[in-house]
Amino acid sequence: MQSAKQKISDMASTAKEKMVICQAKADEKAERAMARTKEEKEIAHQRRKAKEAEANMDMHMAKAAHAEDKLMAKQSHYHVTDHGPHVPQQAPVPAPAPVMGHGYGHNPTGVTSVPPQTYHPTYPPTGHHNHHHY
């Protein structure tokens, strides 16, 4: 039952994304028609791309939420306990605001896309090496 519910929810999210993309394309067409310079036309194009990316991100966030709902429903059948009051789960962490920059994958100063780690692997690993030459 949850699989069907997830599929329907995913289809609704995809349809919403396609609708937003279609609206963004129509907005771009109207902006380009009113634009007088090449730069204004490029700005309209970039706005459309940003709207499409945001719609795509929203769709994927919704699909992740649907998968989480399915998992929680599946797990709740296996973990039936009456050991006290239900403790609500933490709210999901909101997605970071999109960075409007000049390049793909660039982060603002002080922000990294890689979480800090204490483990620093080395290659080749230190120690005795058995090299087999055939």
UniProtKB/Swiss-Prot annotation:
Q: Does the keyword Coiled coil apply?
A: yes
Q: Which UniProt keywords apply?
A: Coiled coil, Stress response
User: In which domain of life is the source organism classified?
Assistant: Eukaryota
List where Basic and acidic residues composition bias occurs: 31-45
UniProt-annotated stretches for the region Disordered: 31-53, 80-134
Q: What induces it?
A: By dehydration stress.
Q: Which Pfam families match?
A: LEA_1
Q: Which residues form a coiled coil?
A: 34-70
> Its GO CC terms?
cytosol; plasmodesma
Biological process annotations from GO: embryo development ending in seed dormancy; response to osmotic stress; response to water deprivation; seed development
State where composition is biased (Low complexity). Answer: 115-127
Query: What is the purpose of this protein?
Result: Involved dehydration tolerance. Involved in the adaptive response of vascular plants to withstand water deficit. May possess chaperone-like activity under water deficit.
Which family does the record claim for this protein?
Answer: Belongs to the LEA type 1 family.
Protein name, entry field: Late embryogenesis abundant protein 6
Q: Which organism is it from?
A: Arabidopsis thaliana
